[in-house]
Every structure is written in C-alpha cells, then in structure tokens.
Amino acid sequence: MTLVNPSEKLILALDGMDVLEALSFIDKVPDLIWVKVGLELFATSGLEIFTELRARGKKVFLDLKFHDIPNTMAGACYRAARNGAELITVHACAGSKALLVANEAAKKGAASVGLPSPTLLGVTVLTSWTSYEFGDELDIHHSLEKRVEHLAQLAFKAGLGGCICSPCEVKRLREIFPESFELITPGIRFLDSGLDDQARVMQPRDAFTSGASRLVLGRIITRSTNPAEAFTRVCRDIQTD
C-alpha cells in the first residue's frame, strides 16, 4: 500500500514550547497537518493555541489525558470538542462509565458549534513504563501487555474511536480490533535517535506496518537541525509497497 498523503498519519508533539515558539516551529514544517497540544503547551497557552493552530489550518490533537470522575471528564471533553479539538485523550482506566459519558459529551460539544464529532482515544499504559517497573511499582500481577489489551477493550466497548499504546503492542491489538479503531502510538525513534525517557519504542516504518493508524513524533523532529527534512524522512519511511 502506498499512502496518498503520509502527512495525515503523523502528529507532531510540541512539548516544552510556549505559544510563540510552537507557532514559529510549525512554520518550519510546511507539510504538517496534525499538532499535539500536551500538558506543557496547554499550561502556557490555554485555548489561545487552539485558535492559532486552527487559523493556520492545523488539526488539534489535545493530549491532556483526562482522568477524573465521570461528570468532570464529560465537562472537560465537551469543552475541548467545542473549542475544536479533533482528537482527545482520556485515561481508559477511568472506567467504562466515565468513558461513555465523556464520549457522548464530546459529540455534543462539537455539535453545539457545528463541528464534526471528535475522536476520543483511551490511554492504555504510558510508553515510559518498563514491564518490570509496571509490575513492581504498581503492584500489578499480570503483564503490561495484558493490561494494555484490557484497557483497549474498555475503550472499544465504550465506543471510543481508538487508543494510545506503545508501538510494541500495536501488532497484537491490530489482530483484535478493526481498522476503524485507531491505534495511535508515541515512542517513535530512528535507530540513530536516542531513547530519552521512552522505554518501549520502534522505528516509524515498523510501527506503521505493525498496524498503527497514526504516529506521534516528538524529539526526532523538534531536535532536528532541519525539521522539514526530518518530517519528510518519516513520511518516506512509512510509505509501504
């Protein structure tokens, strides 16, 4: 399969930047479509970053990983969708009730301003966890992989549009879930890149051919001396025959 527009499958994380830095950076990557607004950027910019990104024709992936009681999660997702977030993360371990009401609230929020329904994504297990740390520190006695699978099932049954997982779990999850259930993965590195604080990583092409729907790119782009060239490199890498 050859992708018509590989840029649509890539999401750039602008962590560690303020609004001006983020906007300046995306101008360096003209083919960029999706931008991830995480905790750091949102904490410094608030909703201003939504307005600025959408004015530039970018799609917003709001990655705040909401995890609270159902009513609070519903309110947060309603407002996020109303402000134009097209992908929104929630922790799957918040439970079925919270996932169900958050998903419905997001649809209502978008509809209230004439926007299409966003896709809610259930966060499974953060890619910074190793299998040993996961079991030892959280005192969980089944495998990390089983936990990821269980949380992905919760998200799927609650009607969410996909989940966040490491590239190491993508192949197994794709065997379980249909293509319509998005598997979005951070932890993307080339062999000549460092691991930084990620523990479960994979190269772009390998993650994509394993079944990932979209890839979240961070430091392999933001730390590059030529971000546009680095982005193009990933686009070429995920093109499959």
Curated annotation (Swiss-Prot):
GO MF assignments: orotidine-5'-phosphate decarboxylase activity
SUPFAM superfamilies xrefs: Ribulose-phoshate binding barrel
Record EC number: 4.1.1.23
Record carries keyword Lyase: yes
Entry keyword set: Decarboxylase, Lyase, Pyrimidine biosynthesis
Known catalytic reactions: orotidine 5'-phosphate + H(+) = UMP + CO2
Top class in the EC scheme: lyase
Residues at which substrate binds: 15, 36, 63-72, 127, 189, 198, 218-219
Any one Gene Ontology cellular component term annotated for this protein: cytosol
Any one GO BP annotation for this protein: 'de novo' pyrimidine nucleobase biosynthetic process
SMART domains to which the protein is assigned, alphabetical: OMPdecase
A Pfam cross-reference name: OMPdecase
Pathway: Pyrimidine metabolism; UMP biosynthesis via de novo pathway; UMP from orotate: step 2/2
The UniProt record lists the keyword Lyase: yes
Alphabetized Gene3D superfamilies for the sequence: Aldolase class I
Active-site residues, Swiss-Prot/TrEMBL: 65 (proton donor)
Function: Catalyzes the decarboxylation of orotidine 5'-monophosphate (OMP) to uridine 5'-monophosphate (UMP).
Family recorded in the similarity comment: Belongs to the OMP decarboxylase family. Type 1 subfamily.
Protein name: Orotidine 5'-phosphate decarboxylase
